[in-house]
UniProtKB/Swiss-Prot annotation:
MF term (GO), any: structural constituent of ribosome
Family annotation (Gene3D superfamilies): Ribosomal protein S7 domain (1.10.455.10)
Biological function: Component of the ribosome, a large ribonucleoprotein complex responsible for the synthesis of proteins in the cell. The small ribosomal subunit (SSU) binds messenger RNAs (mRNAs) and translates the encoded message by selecting cognate aminoacyl-transfer RNA (tRNA) molecules. The large subunit (LSU) contains the ribosomal catalytic site termed the peptidyl transferase center (PTC), which catalyzes the formation of peptide bonds, thereby polymerizing the amino acids delivered by tRNAs into a polypeptide chain.
InterPro entries reported for this sequence: Ribosomal_uS7, Ribosomal_uS7_CS, Ribosomal_uS7_dom, Ribosomal_uS7_dom_sf, Ribosomal_uS7_euk/arc
GO cellular component: cytosolic small ribosomal subunit; ribosome
Family affiliation: Belongs to the universal ribosomal protein uS7 family.
Pfam families for this protein: Ribosomal_S7 (PF00177)
Name of the protein this chain belongs to: Small ribosomal subunit protein uS7
Length: 213
């Protein structure tokens, strides 16, 4: 064989992979367990703001989506949930702890419901975002509240904040770990149950907005 020629047989034996290996390659799963493929968003208005189209192995992007305004809409939704757990001063910056909490919570969700935890989390976020809120109108002297529609991005932001706040408050001075409380909060919110802190807060916000129409 001359210097410029390539041994095709030698190359092809490396290019052709076994079928079971090919099946595994190309399907990125969260924590190498949970698939994004069958997850659906049941609210058409939130499809552009709940990011599940580009699967990731870990919910960590090193602040890539914080550089520009509104870019967080493209941040994977599980990463946004994880970031929201890093609150309350003493937890600031403890990303590894937050990732472990979410991973443990997802295991618990799967054991309790036998469903894909990503689907449960997406359903919880869809159910917890308030559609209507009230804002203050007027200056100094006369201030009144006026009902306003909530944008899809703010609905997602508020839903995530309410879910993580509910889990944090439930685990405070409780024998249950925060992972267990987060799992319970997500399951109740996905069902639309009034046992969920986030659902109760959402209903309260919408009730106040309705009275100020």
């Amino acid at each position: 064989m001359s210097e410029g020629e390539v041994d095709v047989a030698a190359v092809s034996q490396y290019e052709v992979l076994p079928k079971e290996v090919l099946a595994e390659v190309g399907s990125v799963k969260l924590f190498n367990r949970w698939s994004y493929e069958d997850v659906e968003i049941r609210d058409i208005s939130l499809t552009d703001y709940i990011q599940i189209r580009s699967p990731v192995y870990l919910p960590h992007s090193a602040g890539r989506y914080a550089a520009k305004r509104f870019r967080k809409a493209n941040c994977p939704i599980i990463e946004r949930l994880t970031n929201s757990l890093m609150m309350h001063g003493r937890n600031n910056g403890k990303k590894l702890m937050a990732v472990r909490i979410v991973a443990h919570a997802f295991e618990i969700i799967h054991l309790m419901t036998d469903q894909n935890p990503i689907q449960i989390a997406v359903d919880a976020i869809v159910n917890c975002g308030p559609r209507e809120d009230s804002t203050r109108i007027g200056s100094a002297g006369t201030v009144r509240r006026q009902a306003v529609d909530v944008s899809p991005l703010r609905r997602v932001n508020q839903a995530i904040a309410l879910l993580t706040t509910g889990a944090r408050e439930a685990s405070f001075r409780n024998v249950k770990s925060i992972a267990e409380c987060l799992a319970e909060e997500l399951i109740n919110a996905a069902k639309g149950s009034s046992n969920s802190y986030a659902i109760k807060k959402k209903d309260e916000l919408e009730r106040v907005a309705k009275s100020n129409r």
